[in-house]
Amino acid sequence: MSEQKCEITHENEVIKICNYACQLLRYPKLNIEIMHRLKPVTKGRGYVLGYTNLKKNLVVLDVYTARLRKPKKISAILNVLAHEITHHQRPPYRQWHRGRWIIRQHYPRFYKQVNKNIVKIKKDKILKQYFA
């Protein structure tokens, strides 16, 4: 019988780690997907590190660097994941500001929650090895 090698790719490893982090942050039903870019990001343009869909419970993360398409460090991916999970914990709301309605997506309470999530991830005995 031939032995099959079970290689763990960077994407599979990231999905497993992110699913564990979601359980740690009490959002086990979030679906994690990997963003696949068709071409590298050009110089001087903004680019997306990840995005979330609140209705579908979906988080999409970019696990490769923008230009050279090399695998990112797990700690950087976990920081983006903490930010995206916070969008589910502190959803955006509408606010009347200077005579018009605005949608507050990123606000001080939001960023406090992001920092709390990152601290929880860093305190975990399994995930703290990626921040060393």
Give each language-model segment a name.
Residues 2-13, 104:
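A short, highly charged nucleic-acid-interacting micro-segment common to nuclease
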Residues 8-55, 121-130:
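Auxiliary, metal-adjacent structural segments of Zn-dependent hydrolase domains
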Residues 32, 59-61, 81-82:
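Hydrophobic beta-strand residues in large extracellular and virion-surface proteins
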Residues 38-73, 88-92, 102, 106-113:
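Active-site scaffold of zinc-dependent metalloenzymes
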Residues 73-86:
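Short alpha-helix carrying the canonical HExxH Zn2+-binding catalytic motif
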Residues 85, 89-90, 118:
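Short alpha-helix boundary/capping elements
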Residues 96:
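Basic nucleic-acid-binding interfaces
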Residues 99-132:
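Post-HExxH zinc-binding segment in Zn-dependent metallohydrolases
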